[in-house]
Amino acid sequence: MLNIYPRFLLAQLHMDSLATKGTRKAVKEALKSPPNDLSRTYDEAMQRIESQNDDDRQLAERVLYWISYALRPLTVEELQHALAVEPGESKLDEDNIPDEELLTSLCAGLVIVDKESNIIRLVHYTTQEYFNSIRASRFPGAQTSIASTCLTYLSFEVFADGYY
């Protein structure tokens, strides 16, 4: 039973890829050589992310590196706050918090939200394995960015008064 889920995941990610094809010819070409392993499928999802406009690509990459480097599962709100933190600011700008649906839609099917726990996570444990193998080269400044964001967040004025 455990081996069945990755096959459905592979099919779902392939369907997501086909949905982005602009012409029938592009769909036919993609159907001629469907990805037969998850690593290739994840590579193709990353290519779809790379083809987005700069703002969307950067946000998707930030979502992916925050989730893949997190030492514990993050709630949607935690990730939204992390992504909204701006260097040098003394408080969180509520207008800079990205929408939950945007966070998942930009990530080419690689990220889902568990509606019961409100945890935003990678779609499958194999996705985490994939990112474990590529994240250092794919997101070279991620750990520095995460550390900087955490330090900025902890230095917000709201924490100076001891009320949070």
At which residue positions do the language-model features occur?
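Short conserved motifs of the RecA-like P-loop NTPase core
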Residues: 1
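Leucine/isoleucine-rich amphipathic helices and adjacent mixed helix/strand linkers
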Residues: 5-164
